[in-house]
């Protein structure tokens, strides 16, 4: 049975895309069929997987969602890009910002992405959705389409403070739109474990959320080298410097 996981945080720069890529590659290496969906108009996931100019793509997530909004038949085989590491990618580009506006007046507006995801379940073991850094309609669509939500959070005060709003939104989606959604867990990223500040942040997360939400023991350390290689486009090096143990908790 396919499992759909949203990688979500309204704060940017907390390793959502890095987590999505690493999780996807890890699952592929365990023999799973994986589709990753870029649901961010910035197209960071698409670029991380080698799409240099996602804005030039004729078919991407925005065009698929527009077809669904207009109640047109969608060929689910179109637009999927197969990556050399075994992942399939549904890319995204800046046009998703326009879709976000279109959704305001759309019928069943929270379920547009779910319509696409449901059509893909039979082909994959896992579908991972890299959410945009906001709590707008596209993110609500991503949560409505998912079975689980995975929350990377930077080991710093402001990102942790923003968790409350994110978790409230997820519970509202669960109550009104998607009763099946569950927390996969919180993954602490960009951690400098040598500082007392980072340790205090970790304890704060455990204190407020540890009883209700799983917190992964694996953590992504802060790495200057990883940040530099990511900025330079060295995707392989970035993956090698990131946590690779998270998939051990995936069923």
Predicted regions and their residues:
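P-loop NTP-binding core
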Residues: 1-239, 246-249
């Amino acid at each position: 049975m396919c499992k759909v996981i949203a990688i979500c945080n309204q704060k940017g720069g907390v390793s959502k895309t890095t987590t999505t890529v690493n999780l996807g590659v890890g699952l592929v290496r365990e023999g799973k069929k994986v589709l990753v969906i870029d649901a961010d108009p910035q197209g960071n996931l698409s670029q991380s997987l080698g799409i240099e100019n996602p804005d030039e793509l004729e078919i991407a997530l925005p065009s698929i969602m527009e077809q669904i909004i207009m109640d047109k038949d969608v060929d689910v085989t179109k637009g999927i890009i197969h990556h050399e590491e075994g992942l399939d990618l549904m890319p995204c580009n800046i046009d998703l910002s326009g879709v976000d506006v279109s959704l305001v007046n759309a019928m069943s507006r929270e379920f547009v992405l779910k319509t696409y995801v449901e059509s893909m379940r039979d082909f994959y073991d896992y579908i991972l959705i890299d959410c945009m850094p906001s709590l707008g309609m596209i993110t609500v669509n991503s949560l409505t389409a998912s079975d689980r939500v995975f929350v990377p959070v930077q080991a710093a005060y402001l990102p942790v403070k923003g968790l409350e709003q994110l978790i409230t939104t997820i519970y509202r989606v669960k109550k009104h739109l998607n009763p099946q959604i569950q927390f996969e867990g919180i993954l602490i990223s960009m951690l400098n474990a040598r500082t007392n500040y980072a340790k205090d942040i970790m304890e704060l997360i455990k204190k407020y959320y540890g009883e209700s939400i799983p917190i992964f023991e694996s953590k992504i350390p802060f790495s200057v080298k990883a940040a530099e290689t990511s900025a330079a486009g060295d995707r392989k090096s970035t993956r090698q410097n990131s946590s690779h143990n998270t998939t051990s908790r995936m069923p």
